A protein has these predicted regions:
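Glycan-recognition surfaces
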Residues: 32-80, 112-170
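Active-site beta-loop-alpha junctions enriched in small/polar residues
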Residues: 25-31, 90-92, 129-133
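Extended, structured polyanion-binding interfaces
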Residues: 1, 9, 24, 100-102, ...
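Acidic/aromatic-lined carbohydrate-recognition and catalytic surfaces
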Residues: 2-34, 119
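The substrate-binding groove and active-site-proximal loops of carbohydrate-active enzymes
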Residues: 1-5, 52-70, 90-107
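Hydrophobic faces of well-ordered beta-strands that scaffold small-molecule active sites
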Residues: 22-24, 85-87, 126-128
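P-loop/Walker A phosphate-binding loop and immediately adjacent motor/lid segment at beta-alpha junctions
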Residues: 11-14, 106-107, 111-114, 122-123
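Active-site groove signature of glycoside hydrolases
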Residues: 72-96
Length: 170
């Protein structure tokens, strides 16, 4: 996707095109349904990964696991010149580990690690997204910016009700 690498692309955007800040999207589980077991991310920090009951690989919740995962991934992004991250799909984690971790266990350590790592790597420049479940927004120790609703689709009137409910309860 980036013929000369991500760092080169970001440097080009900033120096030649005047882009002040570059952000990267990522999912709280690594990707929507977790990490690819044969992918680079899973291979780079295997002790930081746990397998859910349905076989998804996601950052673990025990002790240093989530910090190890986020530090490895976000460290690479920071070294490439990324300035902030938007971490999506946060409320999916508690559903993915249902029956094996409590909602609090599913989120507290992972959010604490994410906030700590993004604070160190990006000066706290973190946008939390799709994390409108209470176990998510009450377990973020320091990141203040949260998108509190799922996607709003103005051309789909049925999406308005869900959008209003999610924002009213947050």
């Amino acid at each position: 996707r980036f013929p000369h690498g991500l760092a080169h692309t970001i440097a080009l955007l900033k120096t030649h095109y005047g882009v002040r800040s570059v952000g990267v999207w990522q999912a709280f589980q690594g990707y929507w349904n977790g990490l690819d077991e044969s992918g680079v991310a899973a291979a780079s920090c295997p002790t930081a990964i746990t397998t859910t009951a349905n076989g998804c690989l996601i950052p673990g919740s025990r002790a240093e696991q989530p910090a190890q995962f986020w530090d490895a991934w976000d460290g690479e992004l920071a070294e490439a010149g990324v300035d902030f991250v938007k971490v999506d799909s946060q409320s999916s984690t508690s559903v993915m580990v249902r029956g094996t971790e409590s909602y609090g266990e599913a989120t507290w350590g992972r959010h604490q690690a994410l906030d700590e790592v993004t604070s160190r790597r990006f000066g706290g420049a973190l946008i939390n997204c799709m994390g409108m479940a209470p176990e998510d927004y009450w377990h973020r120790p320091s990141s203040p910016i949260t998108r509190s609703s799922d996607d709003y689709l103005p051309h789909n009137p049925d999406s308005l009700g869900e959008h209003l409910i999610q924002n009213a309860y947050c």
